[in-house]
Amino acid sequence: MARYALLRHTGAPDDPSGCHFDLLLEEGDHCRTWRLATVPQLNAAAQPAVPLPAHRKIWLDPRSAAVSGNRGWAERIHAGSYCGVLPNATDADVTLQLEGDLQGCLRIASGRCSLSNP
């Protein structure tokens, strides 16, 4: 099964709030990634999910480190695996089953992310 991770990213120069969360979904030799304002909560309202450039798979491992290019600090706070297939089109809807620290049906559609009961 493919892996996922949620990183707490602080000090990013393009983030006026000072803290956001990067959702990483393993895909081949990299991770498809979205920026979230909060940690997804089961059955909570969907939140904005901003697509980001692919991240390196090293962020799936337990770690905290400075982000290259003086772009802040990131720490992995949740991780696990997922069932399902990421669509080829990066702008297509995503529906996956998460197992691990976060559990449930992850859905990313129309720029919004939600986590619900399976």
Features from the language model and the residues they span:
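A charge-rich, low-complexity, intrinsically flexible signal that marks solvent-exposed coils, linkers
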Residues: M1-P118
